[in-house]
Amino acid sequence: MEQTLALPHGTLSWDDLGPRHSGTVIVLVHGFPHDRGLWSAQVAAHASAFPATRLLVPDLPGFGRSTPLPVAGMDGYADAVAAMLDAAGVATAVIGGLSMGGYVAFAFWRRHAHRVRALMLMDTRAPADTDGAREKRRELIATVTRDGVGTIVPTLIGQQLGPTTRSNDPALVSQLEVLLRRAPASGVIGAATSMIDRIDSTPTLETITVPTLVLVGEEDTLTPVSDAIAMSSAIRGSRLVTIPSAGHLSPLEQPDVVNAAIAEFLDVAELL
């Protein structure tokens, strides 16, 4: 069921599934430049894959049905997630994020650690952008400003989907294209700026004291397996899972395998 919250800057929208008084609440935060549709397979399988849990899947500000923040930033995105929890009557939750959603999860931990029961860091990395990466993001911002979001879609598809998916699943390629093309230019520019400005989360890793899943597609070239290994090594007691035949969007590319990995993690952590 879709929920909407009025905020000072506009509105925040999310899907709310499962029993309202469930013992475990899972939040799934999408990447760049997606919306909650990234998690369509997890939403569809919720009742069977994660039984008796409550699932909250937001559109980050500037994407989907959520309006942009006046000033973009990972802290602002994290605070929007906290506002969603407040509106949903949720004190603590499992916070999961993919790619940019992982950056939001790091910010949420720094700002709202008392509300985190567990973390799921998927196809993401801890370090800040290199100078080269920042320059590429500035070029993306210039392109979107000048020519619109559609001009960057083919490049994003090539970067985000693994070669196995691109070769074997044209329907999923088309699904991602639709998802990317509906991203508002203002949201894309705000999020890209936020990623340029984000801090290095490497020092954050050793402060994480809750059960943590680090998950990565074996074909991910944007945040490769080596990044996941480095994160997992720095987070005490974390669980590392590599997803075969998946690129940067493993929950979309290999949903059954990812759902099983999430369920096993939650079960071991006694959260399922």
Q: Where are the regions that the model predicts?
A:
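Flexible "cap/lid" loop of the alpha/beta hydrolase fold
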Residues: 106, 110-154, 160
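Short beta-strand/loop motif that positions the catalytic acidic residue
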Residues: 208, 214-216, 220
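Catalytic active-site module of serine/aspartate enzymes centered on a nucleophile-bearing elbow/loop
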Residues: 238-272
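Active-site loop/oxyanion-hole signature of alpha/beta-hydrolase fold enzymes
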Residues: 5-17, 37-96, 260-264
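Short beta-strand element of the alpha/beta-hydrolase
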Residues: 23-31
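Active-site glycine-rich loops that stabilize anionic/oxyanionic intermediates
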Residues: 31-34, 99
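Gly/Ala-rich beta-loop-alpha elbow adjacent to hydrolase catalytic centers
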Residues: 97, 101, 105
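Conserved alpha/beta-hydrolase catalytic His-Asp/Glu region
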Residues: 129-135, 147-207
